[in-house]
Amino acid sequence: MDRLGLLCRNIYENNKMTQRELAAAMDISLGTCNHLVKEGLDQELFSFDPVDGSYSLLKGGVDLLRNYRMDSAVILAAGFGSRFVPLTFETPKGLLEVYGERMIERQIKQLHEAGVPDITIVVGYLKETFEYMIDKFGVKLLYNPEYHNKNTLTTLYHARECFIGRNTYLLSSDNWMRNNMYHTYECGAWYSSVYMKGETSEWCLETSKKGLLTGVKVGGEDSWVMYGPVFFSKEFSEKFFPVLEEYYHTPGTEQMYWEQVLADLLNGEVDSHLPGKHHFPVPGMYVNRQPDNQVYEFENLEELRLFDERYRNHSDNIARELISQVLQVPESEITGIKCLKTGMTNKSFLFKVHGKSYICRIPGPGTELLINRKQEKAVNDSVKT
């Protein structure tokens, strides 16, 4: 992470910050900040006016920031979102609303506010539902033909050209950020992180004193974990994507998250998936620590219902409304929803009401063309007798 570049960025965004405020914004000590300010003044990156307490970027600072200007963003939106059924039977997870605003739209607006207009959405499941965004937000859509049976490692492989030679954010369509954490300039690759107290099954980070990622392990306790957006610098992508491509072409990696490639590089375990290959350089990536209540990754419908009360009793979902009517209970009492494997002609899920388990089956289009329901009933009746 170029700390002088980061200092110049903060001055660019707010030229009247105190050194204490600068230190907090950069997640460094006040003493380190004092040293950096002196270094920046000596190198004529910026000047300081003691009368009004303001900084001014000089040509050197402007030139330094030019190398770190953001080029683009890629938003992952190809998956089904099985833990959000029945909502995702009708709507991709990223198009679900939180407090009346679609999660993916909120992120696009935040990116635009930061001066990042070039946005690509990687689509798959219900891809046509994202087409309105081409005109509304000027985004590009990239189709992932393997979305239905492979994981995010494959998604990044298909989107790899969006990263090469560019400074690019990587976002998940179903994340929700309270405050805008994107910038016009980024001074080093990073992964957003939140602190998890107690035991967690998240991907836990090991870092150096300066915040450089040195290791990743799945599960731990009282740890900073991978959570939210990621920034891929040009330099990071140049080293990372050749390894990811090797993984993609290796059998047995189909269900991997892309983060597994990064974890293997940091942990020195690439040869566990690519036998005999140890020559890959480790790309530098830093932790970007976020405060509590800033980044949200909703793991399931229950978490979303706790966060946005609208989903407790009025989800605007046909299946939940029907269950509510048939069983004569408010939607808030429909719990324990779990997706069942989708059949040829229908979609099904388990749920509970007052501790009793039920199955809801939603007939799909073409059901009556494939199945004669009268004949099916006659067969069932004959079996019973």
Residue ranges of model-derived segments:
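A short, conserved structural fragment
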Residues: 41-51
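A conserved alpha-helical element in kinase catalytic cores
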Residues: 356-385
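Short amphipathic alpha-helical interface segments
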Residues: 1-25
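Conserved core of the sugar-phosphate nucleotidyltransferase
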Residues: 46, 177-256
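N-terminal glycine-rich phosphate-binding loop and ensuing alpha1 helix
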Residues: 8-12, 26, 59-130
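Conserved beta-loop-beta/alpha segment of the NTase-like Rossmann-fold superfamily
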Residues: 128-203
